[in-house]
Design a protein with these regions (language model features):
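Short beta-strand/turn micro-motifs composed of small residues
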Residues: 1, 50, 102, 123-124
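Active-site metal-binding loops of divalent metal-dependent hydrolases
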Residues: 4, 104-105
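Short N-terminal binding/cap micro-motifs at the start of the first secondary-structure element
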Residues: 5-10, 130
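Conserved N-terminal catalytic core of the sugar/cofactor nucleotidyltransferase
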Residues: 7, 13, 20-21, 25-101, ...
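Residue-level signal for inorganic ion chemistry
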Residues: 28, 90, 104, 125, ...
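Short, charged, surface-exposed secondary-structure boundary motifs
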Residues: 83-85, 129-134, 155-157
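Conserved donor-nucleotide/metal-binding helix-loop-beta segment in metal-dependent transferases, i.e.
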Residues: 108-134
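Catalytic-core segments of class I nucleotidyltransferases/pyrophosphorylases
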Residues: 142-203
Length: 203
């Protein structure tokens, strides 16, 4: 949630993009409600990673979590240093199995959560994959490669911004590794780098 939302201006000059209402509800509220439905169990905590949006926005997000019977936690990403860096900001909430969702993506979370796997990434075919992180799959549907915003075509399966991890701790180990070793793509710490490391280790 820490981005500036420039593509939705002028609306985002006064309201952060995830809080813009769609059919009467903020985007982020619809997203967490959908995820709560497919999780199939009570959600203990919803952590929001935001920019400097102010106390009113923070309180709105906490109320969204509380409506679902969950604790709401707020973390601030002071600099836009990438998706992995954003998750690092919420490290204190990263325990056990987790769902990570990018709240500024306009889609409905209509899927089945398969908790048998170590991790699940939801993808969608797109016409212009150069604007997204994409995955390459083998014949069995398993991921063979992650590519962040490819400039030449490698796949049209874009990562839509929802992930499930059975072990948040394993993910954090990889995020800490890439940050401690200053491994960047496009000047930022990318989640896809951590995911590729996990894939190579058989996760």
């Amino acid at each position: 949630m820490a981005g500036r939302g420039s593509r939705l201006r002028p609306h985002t000059l006064t309201v952060p993009k995830p809080l813009i209402p769609i059919a009467g509800k903020p985007i982020v509220q619809r997203l967490v409600e959908d995820i709560a439905k497919v999780a199939g169990e009570k959600i203990d905590e919803i952590a929001f990673i935001i920019g400097d949006f102010g106390e009113e926005v923070e309180q709105s997000l906490i109320e969204i979590a509380e409506k679902l019977g969950a604790k709401g936690s707020i973390y601030t990403q002071d600099e836009p240093l990438g998706t992995a860096h954003a998750i690092k900001c919420a490290e204190n909430s990263m325990q056990g199995d987790v769902v990570i969702a990018f709240a500024d993506t306009l889609f409905r979370a209509d899927f089945v959560l398969d908790k048998v796997s170590d991790g699940v990434i939801w993808v969608k075919k797109v016409e212009d994959p150069s604007a997204f992180g994409v995955v390459k799959l083998d014949d069995y549907g398993f991921i063979t490669d992650f590519v962040e915003k490819p400039q030449t075509f490698v796949s049209d399966l874009a990562i839509i911004g929802i992930y499930y991890f059975k072990s948040a701790e394993k993910l954090m180990d990889e995020i800490n590794f890439i940050m401690n070793n200053n491994i960047k793509q496009g000047g930022e710490y990318q989640l896809t780098t951590a995911l590729e490391n996990l894939r190579q280790k058989g996760a």
